[in-house]
Amino acid sequence: MKEHSFYQFALTVRGRKDSKGDLAEEIFNDLSFPKHEKDFNQLSDYIEMQSDISVPMSEFDDLYEEYIEWLKF
């Protein structure tokens, strides 16, 4: 199982031509994003309360699920 943070996973999604790619790009451009965080609740709280990320939270939920699957391989 991989030991990468959500941020590291998001970097692999940058460049996709969909809303998940848009979210990954916004995460990359957010200099305050918690780059070493893995916890869903911590990341979700940050996006909802502290960031200017404009992608719907449902996209974050979907991308986080993809992250969990990605960690398995």
Swiss-Prot record:
Gene3D superfamilies listed in its UniProt record: YozE SAM-like
Family note: Belongs to the UPF0346 family.
Protein name: UPF0346 protein SH1485
Highest classification ranks of the organism: Bacteria, Bacillati, Bacillota, Bacilli, Bacillales
